[in-house]
Amino acid sequence: MANTLEQLKLYTTIVADTGDIEAIKRYQPEDATTNPSLILKAAQIPEYESLIDNAIDWAKSQSDDLAQQLDDASDKLAVNIGVEILKLVPGRISTEVDARLSFDKEQSIAKAHKLVRLYKEAGVDKSRILIKLASTWEGICAAKELEKEGINCNLTLLFSFAQARACAEAGAYLISPFVGRILDWYKKDTGKDYDAVNDPGVVSVTEIYNYYKQHGFNTVVMGASFRNIGEIIELAGCDRLTIGPSLLEELANSQIDITPKLVAATSTVAAEAPLTEAQFRWDFNQDPMAVDKLAEGIRNFAIDQGKLEVMLTAKLAN
């Protein structure tokens, strides 16, 4: 009998949620995703020292202004790590726009253009990149414009149906609904434990997946942020699942019989008129979990971006 991970790959595209090249070699995912927290973690791996040095040298060659050097070094490091990962995966790398731009459409678009340019200079076509943006109204609007330019986007920090619907209506290539962080909120709020079938994160992704398929939206659903393999098994059949190394290892070392739980609708019905900004903000605001977790997610990514910049500042000073 094939292990659980190999069975899962029959129904769902598996993506590695890591910047760790050794983990990617081990589990052979189709794609990989990174975020500011994972880049910070990866930057502390000794094997990546040369990638950091390259980013620092490049940044110094671009400008004499320290703030600009820091911005450039940070972007270049994320791209350098992405380029290394793309040597190992046949599909795409997701690289995230600075979380501090989550409420600035124009600056998010400018940062996306810069990341695409840096990848191009490194010999990587935009067809192998997904630009990650927070699923704020501004992030979704930025994605809408980028998609029209042929720059595919991954809308992340997605916790609510309103966010998912707006992303699909904007023509986003892919969304990353967060499963485990939804579970965290409900466990803390209710004091209850949930089995995988009733896990609020699993229920949320299932609802989004079914809505997309019923209404003929092409936006890819990629479940993210898992707390246990039970959540993953309950989402077998989802378009993609991005999974961290520890859970990939657990799946590879287990032999649980997998059957697809999410199955695409065979017929579609017309979607409703797209949400207006006012409708989106109201619907989103009605979900206290989503409001809390989006704000927290943006803050935490910004904190880790700041930690990375402290490390890079020290290196730029040398």
From Swiss-Prot:
It is found in: Cytoplasm. SUPFAM superfamilies: Aldolase. InterPro entries: Aldolase_TIM, TAL/FSA, Transaldolase_1, Transaldolase_AS. It comes from the Bacteria. Pathway: Carbohydrate degradation; pentose phosphate pathway; D-glyceraldehyde 3-phosphate and beta-D-fructose 6-phosphate from D-ribose 5-phosphate and D-xylulose 5-phosphate (non-oxidative stage): step 2/3. The active site is at residue 132. Its main location: cytoplasm. Gene3D superfamilies: Aldolase class I. This is Transaldolase. The lineage of its organism: Bacteria, Pseudomonadati, Pseudomonadota, Gammaproteobacteria, Alteromonadales.
